[in-house]
Amino acid sequence: MRTVLNILNFVLGGFATTLGWLLATLVSIVLIFTLPLTRSCWEITKLSLVPYGNEAIHVDELNPAGKNVLLNTGGTVLNIFWLIFFGWWLCLMHIATGIAQCISIIGIPVGIANFKIAAIALWPVGRRVVSVETAQAAREANARRRFE
């Protein structure tokens, strides 16, 4: 089912949103001051291309023992910079694509996936794209650690 939905996403606009993310990734590589944003751009590019079966999860959830104060502070600064220069137009791109996809009954699941990516597009630094199973296992392990 994931494969069918990913193909449907690609055909109904996922290709265009992925190109938008690739453009943002290339811009972040070319401009030296945006180089720290490249990893986040690439992670969300993968999610935009294949949204079903993958999930964007914060790195603190993947490795709670290795919490990095620099990532939290620096990540917030980078996210604010990202939001001002890149995030808003990528978010609008996903919202517009999601609305267009929700016009037809077949496109509704894909449109909902675009709305989820739109939220991530605003604040992507510190997120990694992993399989749904890995994200669920990380959340369960964190919950066990909290209650031990």
UniProtKB/Swiss-Prot annotation:
The chain crosses the membrane at residues 15-37, 77-99, 103-125. Residues 38-76, 126-148 are cytoplasmic. It comes from the Bacteria. It is found in: Cell inner membrane. The keyword Transmembrane applies. Its main location: membrane. GO terms for cellular component: plasma membrane. It holds the Pfam family YccF. Residues 1-14, 100-102 are periplasmic. Keywords: Cell inner membrane, Cell membrane, Membrane, Transmembrane, Transmembrane helix. InterPro entries: Inner_membrane_protein, UCP028777, YccF. Coiled coil: none annotated. It is a multi-pass membrane protein. This is Inner membrane protein YccF. It comes from Escherichia coli (strain K12). The gene is yccF.
